[in-house]
Amino acid sequence: MNEYVFINFNVGHKSIIACIGSNENSFLSLISDAFSSQIVSYSHNVDVKINASFDISLTHFNSAFNDYKSARCGLLVNSFKNDMHFEILSLFNSNELHKAAFREIRDFIECLLQKESILTLHSACVSNKDGAICIIGDKFAGKSTLMLKALSLGYNFVSNDKPFLYLMNSSFYAFSLPVSAGIRYGSISMFPDLEYAIKKQVFSEHVEFSTNGRVHLTPRALCEVFNIDYVNNVKIKKFIFLSTSYSNKPNFKSSSRSIERNVLFCNDRNLFDALMASSIIFCKSYEEAVIELER
């Protein structure tokens, strides 16, 4: 018998309710943990139905093979009813398959959200009681290091990369899907508590090591180390652009190009124009950006 969890995605004044069902409670526990800041107890008004079935019969798997698409780890996936119903089938049952199914669901939800009036940025995002700070920057500028510094100062975690932004009452708000933060080893060494937790495998199930010099940490791992919360739908009080290429204050043309190339997705020109018209603080060093965090 399937059990269910309900997730609420707020995009401005609109709520999108997803109902995720599965025959494996351990998989639903993973979903509940990952989407902890967006879980609701129950809803009659379901917009999207998602189901993940594990350890199904070979007959069932073979009969679905021609109608479904192959995905990660040999999962079969398909969407129905104008993408309002998403199905995942697995012949086997394991933690790795659960993680693969979770990633399929997350990618599917991202595609649904891109039908709304949203913008995604190549940026990190943190928040405290006064509002959120969105840290924009090119690769290797130090966004993740600055994000970790903010968490060490007591900011809550929103996103390490690619937050979703929307406008409500003329202000930008940010939320994210649960994506692990890829942190370079050099950045980790700057935060002893984080380095210790990784080395001692305090939360090994929430940590993955890659071959490109990064450690991937789930939002749960970051929250446990820094004793903070994973939050969503927070009002942005400040945009910071972290750069290492400016010897002087950038001019309007160069700063506009810098922001524009870090917009990953936008389906609403008004949203894009509002971002470009926002007051964005350009910092030419990590130290300068830390001062902005502490203001």
What role is predicted for each listed range?
Residues 64-75, 97, 177-187, 226:
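Short N-terminal helix-initiation segments at or just after the protein's N-terminus
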Residues 1-96, 293-295:
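Long, basic/Gly/Ser/Thr-rich N-terminal segments
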Residues 146-147:
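Post-Walker A alpha-helix
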Residues 92-99, 135-138:
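Flexible, glycine/proline-enriched loop segments at strand-loop-helix junctions
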Residues 33-38, 108-111, 153:
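Conserved short hydrophobic interaction patches
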